[in-house]
Amino acid sequence: MAIASVAGPTLAAGILSVASWPWLFAINVPVGVVTFFMGRRYLPDNAVRVLGHRFSWKEALLNAATFGLFIGCVEAYSHDVPVTWVLGGIVSFVIIGTFYVRMQLRERYPMLPFDLLKIPIFSMSVVTSILSFTAQMLSLVAMPFLLATTFHYDAVGTGLLMTSWPLVIVFVAPLAGLMIGKVHPGILGGVGLTIMSVGCFCLSFIPTETGHFGLVWRLMLCGMGFGLFQSPNNHMLLSSAPPQRTGSASGMLATARLIGQTVGAALVALLFHLYGDSAPHDAMLLAGILTLCGAFSSCCRLKVSMPK
């Protein structure tokens, strides 16, 4: 994941140097097609199919409606949607979401394993993951605007500078993985998110006369903290689930990541709607606060024992 994250901004900068911005989206079409056929060819079939369990379109539609309404309500405030529509969306989200959760709790093979959230250390790891990925997406979406409006970088320069964040993760994440057996993952996650929060706060209050190096070390600080957090948190989340439920746990891990990323992007839009040009600084400030909350959540896991 870190290598792909490094390649993303660099490739985007290269594409923008020779083509217009629509190509940033068009390039994903052939990549997606190739990935689809590679997945069909090399990924193993789900063993559940052998047990006679079929894909449930009803569950899929309820899942899409629940998360779609949730994200839509968060984003609606940034698009001047009438309050009555927003309230209607919130009520619909509560009703459909409640029905969906109750249905999932009765399923033997649920699409989302809400029953695993009854395990304290598992649920705390999910919360920590959501907070951290929300903060990460707040930062990654807001930073290009900060670099373009405050520091007047072009698209190519912005992409190259943004590479410094994931580049550090490439080196830090494997080291964090090696420390999992020696240091409690809650400590690694707490320290990592604290470091990331320092980087976010430094970017939020960055002076306008800051040069390239000043920007790079702040971004690298964020990447270092996130890299130190991610691997230990993933390990603790997966290992806290029963061995026969690791597949379900990995699904919840991906869901937590996507919820955080989607909410983070929606919050940036909301901040731009509320605060205009100062939104990038406010987004970095909010990201710093969320990472501190995530650090606290991570450290709280020190008092919770792993399930037997």
Positions of the model-derived regions?
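Membrane-embedded alpha-helical segments in integral membrane proteins
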Residues: 2-17, 42-44, 65-76, 140-144, ...
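ATP/adenylate-binding site constellation spanning eukaryotic-like Ser/Thr protein kinases
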Residues: 8, 30, 66-67, 185, ...
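Helix-loop-helix hairpins in multi-pass membrane proteins, especially solute transporters
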Residues: 1-58, 243
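A generic secondary-structure micro-motif detector
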Residues: 1-2, 103, 133-134
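Flexible interhelical linker loops that connect adjacent transmembrane helices
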Residues: 36-67, 105-120, 181, 244, ...
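C-terminal membrane-cytosol helix-exit motif in multi-pass small-molecule transporters
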Residues: 29-48, 64-76, 92-107, 294-302
